[in-house]
């Protein structure tokens, strides 16, 4: 029975170690994801707060209006001053980070965005001399704003985009722009096609944004034309941003609860390993206790063997998680010390 119990304890010990490997890796990965999620949520809130100050709106449609209504709306939109209408097309690739070093070089087409000149009032773009570009810097002719690092690739860029006759204006490298439609997401070093504002109901790509004055005029037109506002309505950027903020906060809370569950399992696993080890070496430690001695070599071997798992996991995932190693050493040492105090 003694031999059988010893084997059982040994099997349980190594099985628990295997479980610990899985749980430790899971805790660290999920903790790392939680930190990223918290940082992203902060950026979403900050970006949304900034965008809300612009007081812009988007015209949404669930059903295409009749040709007569479309014509009327196009007339009204066309009559709006340029300052009340903005065109914006996000690039295909957006990042959740503003750290340029963490981004990868992408195809020109994937990192291409379109804006009307007046968007430069909202989004800061600087030229190669670090001077901020303004709408008045351009005559109205469409232009490609290209990061200076692509200077040798300009012919290829024009060819790939099908814009051989478009003028090029070089801008400073490594610029980061907050996306106007997605708070907390950023365009990094994109090629920007800037053009005169297009005032029409829809664009082939991207969105048309309206100032509060432009939105007010459109709302009046929608009411006058007696259009069903469930099929055609103006939605403020603020209301859409509020949804984005709520969704990110919900994801953060879910991640927090998940990590709490992971950490609980992790602590339980450490307790189980320590208890099994002490039971496994109970007779040997009992002899040491009779002579009021502590088997330092055996305990040190256990601690080292146990902490190697946590140490390797931390080095592979996040070095900041090396604090888990210290926690385990302190926890296991206290548990073993308390065990010997009772003997």
Residue ranges with predicted function:
Residues 300-318:
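Selective transmembrane-helix segments that form parts of the transport pathway or gating/packing helices
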Residues 3-7, 269-305:
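Interfacial "coupling" helices/loops that link adjacent transmembrane helices in transporter permeases
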Residues 243-267:
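N-terminal membrane-entry
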Residues 15-52:
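Alpha-helical transmembrane segments
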Residues 319-327:
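Short, aromatic-rich membrane-interface segments at the entry and exit
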Residues 37-252:
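Nucleotide-cofactor and metal-assisted catalytic machinery
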Residues 1-6, 326-343:
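C-terminal membrane-exit region of the final transmembrane helix in multipass inner-membrane proteins
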Residues 1-25, 343:
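N-terminal Sec/SRP start-transfer signal
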